[in-house]
């Protein structure tokens, strides 16, 4: 487990997206089409909508047609894809997982949040479909590296997290404020920092509120 800030690994985004490609796509290809209409943790979006957003974001990285990824602009991208056959949505996503990673890696950290967001959305999809390992699937350790980097960029309060696999520092030290402590499952850590619903019994946070940790 990464202890804190470290030199950026430009191969990490591609590695994380490849892991998600290899783990999530087989699940999606065996999922009955009606299940893609299930609601997710993303307000107003179905499983299909989340996947459409993921594919569109990766396509924008590949084409260089980036926008601010606000909720309004994301919804426009998703709405454009609601008329697509499901197979086309999944094809765009699969291609994006494999082609966007090196471009994100070469962007010097500016687009790392896209890679992390894609992996988190994979957790949203797994949770909605009742699949195991939601928010703790293959690539978890790489996702934690990006989570740490993003938490420092967003200047969330310093949190010393104790996880089943080791310890992790996130955020930055605030003047006059001691580090918060978090003991949680792997999935609860991601849920907290991504602003997803989390069972109170899955974590113990002292010295900060869940709302202060959200990085998206």
Regions found by a protein language model. Give the residues of each.
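Structured surface interface patches that mediate subunit assembly and partner/cofactor docking
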Residues: 2-13, 37, 66-68, 105-216
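Surface/interface-facing alpha-helical segments and adjacent flexible terminal/loop regions used
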Residues: 21, 44-47
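Short amphipathic alpha-helical segments enriched in hydrophobics
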Residues: 21, 28-35, 54, 58-65, ...
């Amino acid at each position: 487990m990464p202890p804190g800030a470290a030199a950026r690994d430009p191969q990490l985004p591609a590695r994380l997206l490849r892991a998600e490609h290899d783990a999530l796509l087989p699940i999606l290809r065996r999922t009955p089409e009606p299940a893609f209409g299930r609601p997710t943790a993303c307000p107003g979006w179905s499983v299909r909508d989340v996947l459409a957003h993921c594919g569109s974001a990766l396509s924008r990285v590949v084409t260089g047609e980036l926008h601010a990824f606000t909720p309004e602009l994301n919804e426009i991208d998703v709405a454009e894809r609601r008329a697509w056959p499901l197979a086309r949505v999944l094809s765009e996503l699969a291609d994006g997982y494999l082609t966007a990673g090196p471009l994100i890696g070469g962007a010097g950290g500016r687009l790392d949040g896209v890679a992390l967001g894609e992996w988190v959305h994979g957790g949203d999809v797994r949770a909605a479909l009742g699949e195991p390992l939601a928010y703790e699937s293959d690539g978890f350790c790489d996702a934690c590296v990006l989570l740490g980097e993003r938490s420092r960029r967003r200047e969330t309060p310093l949190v010393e997290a104790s996880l089943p696999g080791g310890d992790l520092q996130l955020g930055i030290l605030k003047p006059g404020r001691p580090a918060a402590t978090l003991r949680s499952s792997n999935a609860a850590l991601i849920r907290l920092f991504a602003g997803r619903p989390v069972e109170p019994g899955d974590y113990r946070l002292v010295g900060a509120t869940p709302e202060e940790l959200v990085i998206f």
